From Swiss-Prot:
It comes from Eremothecium gossypii (strain ATCC 10895 / CBS 109.51 / FGSC 9923 / NRRL Y-1056) (Yeast). ATP-dependent RNA helicase required for ribosome biogenesis. Involved in the release of U14 snoRNA in pre-ribosomal complexes. Required for pre-rRNA cleavage at site A2. One of its GO terms (biological process) is rRNA processing. Residues 276-435 form the Helicase C-terminal domain. Belongs to the DEAD box helicase family. DDX10/DBP4 subfamily. Signal peptide: none annotated. SUPFAM superfamilies: P-loop containing nucleoside triphosphate hydrolases. This is ATP-dependent RNA helicase DBP4. A motif (Q motif) lies at residues 41-69. GO terms for molecular function: ATP binding; ATP hydrolysis activity; identical protein binding; RNA binding; RNA helicase activity. The gene is DBP4.
């Protein structure tokens, strides 16, 4: 084998000195760099390391965009950054380059652990960031990892302790912080939030707060998004006190410009809710040579529209993507859509942010977005990196005026399009025929109807989304249904709670129910025979219980007008279960029963008391007199004192609760680490006790004959115990010259085998 060339000690010292000098020069360049005077055009003009420049050049990133030119120098100087720029302006490189440079300046190694954390709201965006990082960090000696839902958690746990740059979604990152023993965030240098406004909203609030509580406050924080939040409460949660606001949307010149790309042509059409699918199908039929994304409000709608349009064959490839799909299917769909030229993708907002699809011609928003920020992110999937693109928004007459006013407030004024009647085609008869033939499609249509109605109900902007004015019967007929299905709508609080649970990791929910040792009580699994499975089998498609509940007829409603309804049919009564109706036989018993009734009736309702320091009882809720109340001051003063007192108490209790939760989490991790250590020690003890060193006795001089006896036992029953080798000049005389037997250890590697062969040949 060819030996690796190793540097001498002197050369190693020289190399380290050169690296130290280059790093000092680079740090001086960063201090002297002024973005206003030094108008950098390419990445090579920036004070960054040669490895980063080389990686950017090989990945074809030469010239900088406006957000990169503004954000990278500020981040290199160690400031916290709040970055905002239009969609498709290159925000990913604006935070990945400072991440690499930060760890390079700190001379980060694998032994230092986690140095940078990048949080993304969606799995697809996290995968895209990871791919870009691998490209530009090719010549840097850092390890990077991706942790997202839908992947093997145990596989990630084994490797997460050796990662320097970790990219992931909030739920999976929090799960690793709670479960992975090797993940240590106490030495974190930089935190990045991509699409920060989405990460800071209610859906990820608890997960993000828990993640930030595990991070050191001395870190550098970078926040990037196309629609940035400057709420003081949100920034305080991330410990952003002294930060710099950068971006193309910051400054006096940008105040009169919209937040959408300049090359994006924006249109809208007024269409009634029952006519939306007709217009959508007609639009797809007239744009067969285009690449388009169609946004719908729920995964059920995406599934229904995809299945029905696929059967009607509009003449273009159709794909669908939503959050309820498996991760492998989502990744495969993203890859196919990126490589396709003429294709239509039906999707929810799971790809509305950050995802870079090449050459998207049209973005169609079939359902009205919940706010202007969502509109900007959806429309931003087209016209990226200076290319042209078009956006089409469908608005109902109830939504038109209010939502256009919201858009005008952000300087966005889409042009109105009129639909040609010759291009319009009704697909309602085809949908009715499909639903009549296929009960599963009918089930999907009912679920799509229910999910759309619920999505309108939970919207906060009631001026745009008018729930009471929805034409439900006409909308159901447009989906091919004979009538509007029953919709059970819970309160908004329960819906928001369900939405919050949707973004929470299932493993984290299980871990929350764990005991102090971190163990989750699992139900004992009973053995099910094939007969149990056969009798307990249910149809999971058409005749499922959920399907029957939705499609049940109105027979039950016919009896609703009856005055009395049957709750239970006639059944036999067990006499043993009936109570005794006889009175007490003795006079004493009768008197006792009567006295109890009399005493209870005279006592009245029970009351509870609390005792003061002197032992005097007082009712729990005791009202003060008017004079006593006014002695303490006026109402406003007392309210302020009470609020300040309670606020101080809640803040103190909140700090104590956070500290307690942190200590419990650390204790759980410590116990798991201790259990792993004991397990490793037990395995080592077993190896020391049973695994004696294997010895091969070579006496023939023919290595192939001696090593071929692999089927024979390793130890002969009468073999002598291994002898200790003698050192010095007596080592040769220790071997017996008469027998010609030489004692050696069994070769483990190829190098050991080569050295053993050379010794045997030399005799």
């Amino acid at each position: 084998m060819a030996k690796k060339h190793r540097l001498t000690t002197v050369k190693r010292k020289e190399l380290r000195q050169k690296e130290s000098e280059a790093l000092k020069q680079l740090q001086e360049r960063i201090k002297d760099y002024d973005a206003k005077t030094c108008r950098a055009v390419t990445f090579q003009d920036l004070p960054i390391s040669s490895g980063t420049v080389k990686g950017l050049k090989e990945a074809a990133y030469i010239k900088m965009t406006d957000i990169q030119r503004a954000a990278i120098p500020v981040a290199l100087k160690g400031h916290d950054v709040l970055g905002a720029a239009k969609t498709g302006s290159g925000k990913t490189l604006a935070f990945l380059v400072p991440v690499l440079e930060k760890l390079y300046h700190e001379r980060w190694t694998e032994l230092d652990g986690l140095g940078a954390l990048v949080i993304s709201p969606t799995r697809e965006l996290a995968m895209q960031i990871y791919e870009v990082l691998v490209k530009i960090g090719k010549y840097m000696s850092f390890s990077a990892g991706l942790v997202i839902g839908g992947k093997d958690v145990k596989f990630e746990m084994e490797r997460v302790s050796k990662i320097n740059i970790l990219i992931g979604t909030p739920g999976r990152l929090l799960q690793h912080m709670d479960q992975s023993v090797g993940l240590n965030t106490s030495n974190l240098q930089i935190l990045v939030l991509d699409e920060a406004d989405r990460c800071l909203d209610m859906g990820f609030k608890k997960a993000l707060d828990a993640i930030v509580s595990n991070l050191p406050p001395s870190r550098q924080t970078l926040l990037f998004s196309a629609t940035q939040s400057q709420s003081l409460a949100d920034l305080a949660r991330l410990s952003l006190a002294d930060y710099k606001t950068v971006g193309t949307m910051d400054g006096p010149s940008s105040k009169n410009k919209p937040a959408t790309p300049e090359n994006l042509e924006q249109f809208y059409i007024q269409v009634a809710l029952p006519d939306k699918l007709d217009i959508l199908f007609s639009f797809i039929k007239s744009h067969l040579k285009s690449k388009m994304i169609v946004f719908l409000s729920s995964s059920k709608q995406v599934h229904f529209v995809y299945e029905t349009f696929r059967k009607m064959q509009p003449g273009i490839s159709l794909m669908h993507l939503h959050g309820r799909q498996k991760q492998t299917a989502r990744t495969e769909t993203l890859d196919k859509f990126s490589r396709a030229q003429h294709v239509c993708l039906f999707s929810t907002d799971v790809v509305a942010r950050g995802i870079d699809f090449p050459s998207v011609d049209w973005v169609i928003q079939t359902d009205c977005p919940e706010d202007v920020d969502t509109y900007i992110h959806r429309a931003g999937r087209s016209a990226r990196y200076g290319k042209t693109g078009k956006s089409l928004l469908m608005l109902t007459p109830q939504e038109e005026d209010a939502f256009l006013a919201r858009l005008k407030g952000k300087l966005i004024e889409p042009s109105k399009l009129n639909i040609k009647q010759s291009k319009r085609k009704s697909i309602k008869p085809q949908l009715q025929s499909l639903l009549f033939k296929d009960p599963e499609l009918k089930y999907l249509a009912q679920k799509a109807f229910i999910s759309y109605v619920r999505s309108i109900y939970i919207q906060k902007d009631t001026e745009v989304f008018k729930f009471n004015e929805l034409p439900l019967e006409e909308f159901a007929a447009s989906l091919g249904l004979p009538g509007a299905p029953q919709v059970k709508i819970k309160g908004k609080k329960s819906i928001e709670k369900a939405k919050e649970l949707k973004n929470t990791s299932r493993q984290l929910l299980l871990l929350a129910k764990a005991n102090d040792d971190g163990e989750v009580d699992s139900k004992e699994k009973t053995v099910r025979t094939k007969y149990d499975k056969m009798f307990g089998r249910k149809n999971q498609t058409v005749l499922s219980e959920h399907y029957m509940n939705i499609t049940k007829t109105g027979a039950a409603d016919d009896d609703a007008g009856d005055f009395m309804t049957i709750k239970r049919t006639d059944h036999e009564l067990n006499e043993n279960d009936l109570p005794q109706l006889t009175l007490p036989t003795s006079k004493r018993g009768q008197k006792k029963a009567l006295s109890k009734k009399a005493s209870l009736s005279s006592k009245g309702n029970p009351t509870k008391f609390k005792f003061d320091a002197d032992g005097v009882p007082h009712p729990i809720y005791e009202l003060e007199g008017e004079e006593e109340f006014h002695k303490k001051g006026d109402v406003d003063t007392q309210v302020k004192e009470f609020l300040s007192k309670e606020t101080e108490y809640m803040a103190r209790a909140d700090t104590e609760d956070k500290q307690l939760v942190k200590e419990k989490r650390q204790e759980k991790k410590r116990k798991r680490l201790e259990a792993m250590r004991r397990e490793m020690e037990a395995l080592q003890d077993d190896d020391d006790e049973y695994d004696a060193p294997t010895v091969a006795y070579v006496g023939t001089g023919n290595l192939s004959d001696d090593m071929a006896s692999g089927d024979e036992p390793d130890f002969a029953p009468a073999s002598p115990p291994p002898r200790k080798k003698l050192k010095g000049r007596y080592s040769e005389s220790a071997e017996s010259p008469d027998t010609g037997v030489m004692e050696v250890e069994e070769p483990d590697t190829l190098e050991d085998l080569e050295s053993l062969t050379a010794r045997l040949i030399s005799g």
